[in-house]
Amino acid sequence: KQMEGIERRVAAVEEQKKNDEQLSQERETARSRRPENDGLKQLKYQTEDKLDTLRRLQCIPTKRAEDAKKLLEGKRSIVIKGNPGEGKTTMALHLIDNEMYRDKRVVLYCTHDWKTVDTHHVDIVVLEDVFGQYDFDPSRLQEWMVYLPTIEEHVDAGKLRVIVTTRADILSKAYPRLGKLKLFSEDLSLTLSSEQLKYSEKMSILNRQLYRHERNLKEDEKEKCISNFMGLIGFPQCCSLFAGDNKLFDRGPEFFNYPNKFFVANISELEDKRFMH
């Protein structure tokens, strides 16, 4: 009789477990059928608009882009860091411009954007300039720290992929306050640096910007632009600034010697022309 009682209790526990699983599945199905909220629809529209722009620009694929793709596929999350103008945002957009993420990808700029995300309607998110755009912003960090553990749980559960973009100097200031978050561990980070670009990649990037802005430059001058390059602004953005602005283009290869100096001198005008990214 004692054995029969134990068996009945085990059977009851198993039955309860089965009922709980069924109820959980029914709730999950109901959530998956929920329509998208208006905020999420707007974010998706804005994201697709950015991807359309990216495709028109026909950005140059690089070895580093392949490295980023492999890391994202293997780990489900990646932190893309580097100096201004290295192409962090472009890289992030390139990674989500994949048929497997169609209609389920969004770029987020703040925690308010994250609140609109439903993982039944989103497979991948980009957290853009997560801790500040031009300098470390403690208030942004504090806001994101409320949600980053949940985002990490979604990644671990296979419900979401995450791409974080941040300037390297800003991330270094945020590190001490990130606690045990695995999202920002070194093995999930990829640094973009112009020093990593091959000569052929730099030439392709320069040629693409010259073509885009209908500029002509002799081959020896192009070579000087590449060999002269120095500065804290990434080579990709230097090429964009150089080809897109008459004053900077008139400087010729000299611009690439001291792009920071010319950038600061013309920053207001360049911001108006939306060259900054």
Question: Where do the protein language model's features map onto the residues?
Answer:
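Substrate-engagement module of ASCE P-loop NTPases
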Residues: 145-160
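Amphipathic alpha-helical "lid/sensor" segments that cap RecA-like P-loop NTPase cores
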Residues: 19, 31, 35-36, 168-180, ...
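Post-Walker A helix-loop "phosphate-sensing" segment adjacent to the P-loop in P-loop NTPases
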Residues: 97-107
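Charged, amphipathic alpha-helical interface modules that flank catalytic cores or transmembrane segments
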Residues: 1-67, 73, 94
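Conserved P-loop NTPase "ATPase switch" module shared by AAA+ and STAND
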Residues: 110-112, 118-145, 165-168
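Residue-level preference for the first positions of well-ordered beta-strands
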Residues: 77-79, 105, 124
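Hydrophobic, repeat-rich solenoid/adaptor surfaces of innate immune receptors and signaling proteins
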Residues: 79, 95, 126-129, 161-168, ...
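Walker A/P-loop nucleotide-binding motif
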Residues: 74-91
